[in-house]
Amino acid sequence: MPVRRGAGLALAFVLVLAGMVASGAEAASRKSRASTPRVAASIVVDMNTGSILHAEAAETPRYPASLTKMMTLYVLFGYLRAGKITPDTELVVTPHAASQAPTKLGLKTGAKIKVSDAAKALVTQSANDAAATIAENLGGSEENFARVMTDTGRRIGMTKTVFRNASGLPNEEQITTARDMAILAAHLIHDYPQYYNVFETKYFTFKGRKYRNHNKLLFGYKGTDGIKTGYTRASGFNLAASVHRGNKHLLAVVLGG
């Protein structure tokens, strides 16, 4: 994809993203952020032309954190489109899934959750127990599912990404780049338009509890239609975002903001 330089709109978008990421990441304190300084990796793509409007350290390996769940959902959408499951298919929670670290829904071993609810749980609460439940029910084990995720990434052009789990919880071998995450986000938009709108979900109610999407852009930046936030201490604040303004459609990824 060609790089267009001097794209002021793209740079402004990155700055907005960086600010929103810093204020709205998943259960992370400003103190912990200040103690782990890093240079953010970023990329902005014009979705109408495929041109790269801005790129900084876009090929540098980073930890994806919960942006991992975009690939978990990409694989899930493939199962839905193939008719192997439906939105109402019930997934069974295993002890492994129930034991995942926060953030989570608090699913109990032996409980069941519908595919549609699991998908919304990933998008809003970034629920690690729901991610592991998807992985084990579709892949037999989370390890097997992670291999499918990596192989799927290679197929769509993610040349520097390796997945070891379905949630994005810390694993030194689970790496990606801003470019690869932009490729994944673009494929989610183009390949699964019938399912992509799940990323617009602002609120999700499950078992009587209401969850608010961690992506503050959905609430405060006009034209945002998704997609995902992520945070670990090792990764810093991560965000992939898709925004429509008039006839413009920009896709941006910031890793380590």
What are these regions (language model features)?
Residues P2-G8, A22-R33, V39-A41, N48-H54, ...:
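Structured C-terminal helix/loop/strand segments within mature extracytoplasmic catalytic/sensor domains
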Residues A25-R179, I189:
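Active-site-adjacent loops and short helices of periplasmic peptidoglycan-processing enzymes
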Residues M158-V162, P170-G257:
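Domain-terminus/edge residues, biased toward the C-terminal soluble/receptor-binding domains
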